[in-house]
C-alpha cells in the first residue's frame, strides 16, 4: 500500500515518514498547500488503493492550507490515518468543534485508556503515549467512535465505514513506547477495510 503523506509543515513529519518507511511502506510526501484536485488525481492513478496520512502541525485545521479541502475530497474514497492536527481536522470534517484543551502539553508522557479494538490488539488496556497539543476535538458526532481517551480528551477516533482512524497523540514519539507496533497495526487495519 502506497502512502500519500500530507505534511502540515511540522517538525515531526519526517519522524513519521521514517517510521512508515521502516515498516516497508512507500511514502510520497506532499505539503498541505498542494492543489487537492491534483493530489486526488495522483491517488486515483495508483493500481492499489493508497492511504492518505495527515501529519501533525501547528495551528488549527482552518489555518492549515488546503487540508480541509483535501479531506473533503478524499473522505469515503480512500482510507485516512491522522495524527494530532490530523485527528482534529478529521473530527472537524464530521462536525466536531476544535477547542482549547484544559491542559497545554508539548512533550508529555501520558497513560491513556484503550477500548477493545483491532488496532490495539496485543497492546494492553492502557498505553503510555507522547502528547504535544493545546487543542482538542469536542462534541464528536456519533459516527466517530472514541476508542482511546484521557481526561475526556479523545485520544483515538475511528469510523470504520469511512475508513478513518486518527490519534491525538504522536505514535512516532520516543515517549510512545509501542508506537511502531501501533502504526503497523493501524495501516494494516485500514488496508483490510479498503
From Swiss-Prot:
PROSITE patterns: GATASE_TYPE_1. Keywords: Amino-acid biosynthesis, Aromatic amino acid biosynthesis, Glutamine amidotransferase, Lyase, Tryptophan biosynthesis. Its EC number is 4.1.3.27. One of its GO terms (biological process) is L-tryptophan biosynthetic process. Residues 2-194 form the Glutamine amidotransferase type-1 domain. L-glutamine binds at residues 57-59, 88, 134-135. The keyword Lyase applies. InterPro entries: Anth_synth/Amidotransfase, Class_I_gatase-like, GATASE, TrpG/PapA_dom. It comes from the Bacteria. It catalyses: chorismate + L-glutamine = anthranilate + pyruvate + L-glutamate + H(+). The active site is at 84 (nucleophile), 170 (for gatase activity), 172 (for gatase activity). Pathway: Amino-acid biosynthesis; L-tryptophan biosynthesis; L-tryptophan from chorismate: step 1/5. GO terms for molecular function: anthranilate synthase activity. One of its GO terms (cellular component) is cytosol. Disulfide bonds: none annotated. Signal peptide: none annotated. NCBIfam families: trpG_papA (TIGR00566). Heterotetramer consisting of two non-identical subunits: a beta subunit (TrpG) and a large alpha subunit (TrpE). Part of a heterotetrameric complex that catalyzes the two-step biosynthesis of anthranilate, an intermediate in the biosynthesis of L-tryptophan. In the first step, the glutamine-binding beta subunit (TrpG) of anthranilate synthase (AS) provides the glutamine amidotransferase activity which generates ammonia as a substrate that, along with chorismate, is used in the second step, catalyzed by the large alpha subunit of AS (TrpE) to produce anthranilate. In the absence of TrpG, TrpE can synthesize anthranilate directly from chorismate and high concentrations of ammonia. This is Anthranilate synthase component 2. It comes from Helicobacter pylori (strain J99 / ATCC 700824) (Campylobacter pylori J99).
